[in-house]
């Protein structure tokens, strides 16, 4: 905001009058231009008098600097004309004192030695004291002026009320022009405020759209995550069922393998027992062959004996050989029958067990082959399920990574928006503080204007009474001269 320039003339006088009236004739360390520092136009007066901005409308403003720049109004071209009142008096003129008739009224002392300053001192006048020597206190300095009893100065004292009246009227006109400019500035600020609110709405819409888009992306990611988790749970259930089935098949396979091993052990035992029986049969066959050889030899001997000439001894020997041959045949038949009775059931049982073991082995091998054939698709399915599970885990990891990135981005955007909100709040607080200052300035200006008007009203009345008294004095002088 541009620094205001000090005002001259009537502003300093009005301020001095107001200060002396409030502080009961105490010296003030302020110059006549101190009021002008609060006089500069601030757009926050418009906001405080017309209405405050809505906080929800400015929460999403990008930069508070633009708001401050648009709310400031430059000084008008005729600021010096509105703030300065030039005096038309000569610097050689002395201090003029106006004494009202009532001793309790204030005395207005106007010093015209300096063209840039008008000093007003208000204070009660004691009826017994003369007012010719007067002490003026302003900014810690005491000014003593003695009124001269010169007829020229008395004429100047008579002419000063009319000049003060002219200056006061011009000051009022300038103040009215200043207030008109303030009203125009207020209207312009209202238009700028509406434009800024419209820009705020336009700036807030993309941010809201981005936030909604981020929310939709997060919801879609959560949906994909939930769907992937459901698929993962379904695949885990299928894998569990396949594992149970595979465990059952493996258990049955182990049981069949145990039975096969038992049958193989039985077959091995049967083979050993068969070898024993075969060895026994071989021994018996050898014994039988030996017996047959012995029998053939005896038979040949007996035949030779029979072919020999018969004799008594030969007959006896022939009978004996026949008896021995019959015994031998009976013995062979009995031994063969005993062997058949002893080993044939065992051999038949062994053959039956061998056939049953062979059939069981073939059946077990067929079942094992079938189980292997059935296990191959299960293994392929298990491999496929493991591959799908790995792919799903990779997809879940990617979805989680994407979700984390989106959440991080959303958090960063949220932090940026919170930072903007804090900046906007600080800007709003500063703006409210400026509004309060401008409201105080407006109130002080209104109070000063009312004080100035109250000062001008008795002066105008005194100036209206002064011509009549002056005319009466001239008549008395003319009569005295006659």
From Swiss-Prot:
Name the chain's protein.
Answer: Syncoilin
Start and end residues of each stretch annotated as Linker 2? 310-349
Residues covered by region (Linker 1): 205-231
Gene behind this protein:
SYNC
The major lineage groups are:
Eukaryota, Metazoa, Chordata, Craniata, Vertebrata
| Ranges for region Coil 1b | 232-309
Q: How does it assemble?
A: May link the dystrophin-associated glycoprotein complex (DAPC) to intracellular desmin (DES) filaments. Interacts with DES and DTNA.
Q: Where in the cell is it found?
A: Cytoplasm, Perinuclear region
Presence of the UniProt keyword Metal-binding in the record: no
Q: Which residues form a coiled coil?
A: none
Species for this entry: Homo sapiens (Human)
Give start and end of each IF rod domain.
168-463
